[in-house]
Structure formats: C-alpha cells, structure tokens
Amino acid sequence: MHDKPDESVGRLIEEFLTARATRKPSPHTLAAYRRDLTTIAALVSEDETTPLPLDQLPITALSPRVMRTAFARFAAPRAAASVHRAWSTWNSFFTFLVAEGVVPGNPMPAVGRPRTPLPQPKPLRGEDTPEELLAAVARDDGRQRDPWPERDLAVLSLALCAGLRLSELLALRVASLAGRPGERRVDVAGKGGRPRTVPIESGVDRVLADYLDSRRRRFGARSVRPDSPLLVDRRGEPLRRGGLQYLVESCYRRAGIGDRVPRGARLHALRHTFATRLAEDGASAAEIMRLLGHASLASSQTYIEVTAGQQRAAVRSNRTNRALAVLVGGRGDDS
C-alpha cells in the first residue's frame, strides 16, 4: 500500500517494470513497456500548464480526459497495432496501481481502444522452399570464411520443425533438449512466461546431436554443459538477437530464396511455415495453440482460416472448374 496520493509517474513506472520483470519477459518486451509508458506520460506532461519531468508529474494528473487527449496525439502518426499495444500496457499499469492502492480506479476503459485485425501468417512462399533452404544450408559453402553448417542447420530446424520464436531460440540451454529416444522434446521458455514442451522428431534430434558434436570439436566438451546456451556464435559466445537475425538472413542468401521470404517476417517466416504446414496436415487450432505457445485460440485459428482460403483458391484455379464455369455461363445454383 502506498501512502502518498501524488506519487510521481516516473517512480511508479519503475515500480511497475520491476514487478513485471518477475514474470521473466524478454528484454525486448520490457523495453516496449517502458517506451509505451514514458512516451504517453511525456505527452501528458507537455499538456501541463508548466511541463514537468516524469519524476515530478503526479499520478493524479492522469485523469480519463487527460489520457484520452494524450492517446489521441499518440495515435495520430502511428499504426493501430502500436496504439493497441500501448493501450494494453497502460491498462496493465493502472491495474497494477489499483492493486497497490495508489489510485482508486483505472481510467483506461474511458480511453478508446483501437480494434486491430489479427496479423496474417507470413510463411515462406513456394511449396518446396523449406526443403530447398535446408538442403542448401546443409552443404558446406566454400564461400564462407568459417562455415559451420551444423550450427546453421540446427537453428533452421528448431524454427521450421518446432516453431520457436527468436527470443525462445536465444533462451534455450543444452539441457532444454530432453526425453528418451523416440520421445525427444525441447523445453521452451515461452512468451509471457508461458513454458511449453514441443516434441521433436528423429531428423531434428539428429541435426541437434550433430551440431553439439561439432561444437565439442570446436570448443571442447566443457562448451556443452547442461546449463550452457544451446546456440552460440563462431567464437563460442552465446548468440544474440542481431547475430541470430544475420545468421538466418545469410542462410536465405546462400539458398537463393530471398524473394520468397515475406517482407517484415525474416525469422518469423520459419515459425509461420511450421504452423501453416501443421494446419495443412489437419492439426486443430487447439493443437497449433499448444505447439506455438499462443496466448489465445484466435491467433492459432488464423492458420486454419488461411489454409482453408488457399485450398478454395486452388480449387477455383483448377482448369476443369474454369471450363465448367464457362460452360454454364457463370449461372448460380437455382435448385
């Protein structure tokens, strides 16, 4: 319980972020929380008669009217998805403050919340593109200064055959690979602190074993202790976000498939390909939700709907259907 009714917004933001950190979100997520909170708070401060720094702006200044005005200014140059995310962050912030006894109520229901469509899947384009990518990366490329195809193939396999996010790949440890032969799995520290287990088949298991063997040869047995990061760079250091993104980009270039990777979904295209193929092979939305670690069934359902749409488009493009449409002159079914 807080005793001072006019505690500063800046201090309370720090308290909220500290509380959120106990849920083990990714550094990227925590940075997004901070950015959403401080950006809106700065807009509120600018509208004060005498603008105040955030460590002097009282929380009581954040009335529903003030928050509506700040969000209207924030929304003007931004996409609906960005505004939606910021609204959710501020709603969580005020929910925390109510629980802590800092404020009597949450003003966010009075602030318009934009409705955003669920993002559509962006898998690799082309029926055989995933197989072409894996085959190209598995080959030793003489153009590379220090090729490590075993490591590169391990990264692609975990994304394409287990559907892991970038942050989940970076969080893996050697001990994350577990299970008896025939029941192998990868234990994933999922988004939002939701752990999950993803089964891996013999092909992926073999790829990962080959990678760890190659790592022992490069850096010694101590480099693959159970608590060691699973994915490392060519110096044996833990892979970082930029390094992993660059690795995947270089794999696309080596395979010559850059034009088949959707814009804005470079590594995520591999995860989307995993989910899309699950849907094509008949997996339910609930199964996709569990395997991908989605927070809601709606996210998983988009893969089912897209696949159904693609199936209808394929049927529509069938030459026999087109010929029949010409034959009947496009008449509807009157029966």
Predicted regions and their residues:
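Conserved catalytic core of the tyrosine transesterase superfamily
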Residues: M1-S335
